[in-house]
Amino acid sequence: MDIDEDEDFYAPDEPQAAPPTTAATTTTPATTTTTAAPTTTTTTTSTTTASAPPTTTSSSTKPEDELEEGEEEDEGGGAMDEDDDSDIDIITERKDGSAPPPPVQSRYSEIRNIPQRAAANDNGVKTAPVKKSDGTNSNSNSSSNKFGGGGGIGNEQKTRQGSGAAGGSGAELPPVRTSKIEVDGIPVYKPVGKPITGVVIDEDLPENDKPWRKPGTDLSDYFNYGFDEFTWALYAQKQEALRGEYNAEAIAANNKKMMEEMTNMMMMGGMMPPGMGGPGGPGVGPAGPGAMGPGGPAGAGGMGGPGGGLDGMPPEMQAMMQQMMGAAAAQGMDPSQMGQMGMAGGPGDMGGMGGMFGGPGGGPGGPGTGGMGPGGPGGQGGQGQQFGGGFGGNQGQGGYGGYDQMGGAGGGGRGGRGRGRRW
């Protein structure tokens, strides 16, 4: 660029001129713009000739000359760049054949220096990675031999063998360490010899052992999870009650006790004689329409208590019977009328609660309503259901359409042939 400007500046002093170039520039500006500009540039740089005097050129050609000069500058710079590139020599091999020095390893390996996996060639054969530790191994071997140590290769092989054996058998690995703290255990307060949940602060601890009561102390140094002296006492009491209630041994003991009570109740019920019940009260239910056939014989007495009450029964039996009566009352039934429910089928109506529990039947019943014949004899309570409570045998056939109501084994009194439903 500097050379071209100097040539333009000193152009009038040189004797040589280029009339063809001037004529071409003056006569054909379009041609100069398209095709003649490179030719003019080449001529100017190679022959170092100057253009014509400024008087011969017209004003219309000045912008074109300026463009040509700019083009000359660009092309000249490109030529210089090409010359600079041609001077660079790339040497890929060492002339002396010496090994390269060992690479300097930094403290932290960079990502780009991490060795990649060997890529497969076009033939499908994998190339083995090149080892860079030839010089370092030789230096380490010589230094170790110099100081009387074993060879580096031998030590490396031994370490590899030892690591393989340890990884295979696991005998040389360090033992697995586990915590020895029992998480679910309750620590024992040694001065008192009680578990920490059973220590009573006011009784087991003297005044000197209550530093949290001193002014300015932090309770979190002595109580965790936001407890204080009083909430801790409530928590310990609750924990003790829960452990006593839901302990496996306590539950097993309660179950065993309940089984023994049930067994005693069953044995007492089986040992009672059949005629233990007292006489029942008089029948109070009206006679229903008679069923077919005459009344059957009276059934055997049940195991019920005395007629009219539960005085001779064990407490457990009385409690269960009270539960049964409560359940009947909950269903809308009147417990006082249970002796009349469905048992007034014939004249031999079972009276009172004594008939329910196997006592003998009540007094003679009245004639059947609309019956064609006399009523049968008074029926006694049959063999009782559920804890010996007999409700009479087949006595519900006469009462209000003849539904069989809780019949036992004994035959109750049946009315005469009446207008009831035939069964």
UniProtKB/Swiss-Prot annotation:
Residues 19-61, 135-146 have a biased composition (Low complexity). The keyword Zinc-finger does not apply. Coiled coil: none annotated. It holds the Pfam family Fip1. Residues 360-415 have a biased composition (Gly residues). Residues 1-11, 65-90 have a biased composition (Acidic residues). Residues 1-178, 278-307, 360-423 are annotated as: Disordered. InterPro entries: Fip1_dom, Pre-mRNA_3'-end_processing_reg. Keywords: mRNA processing, Nucleus. One of its GO terms (cellular component) is mRNA cleavage and polyadenylation specificity factor complex. Belongs to the FIP1 family. This is Pre-mRNA polyadenylation factor fip-1. The gene is fip-1.
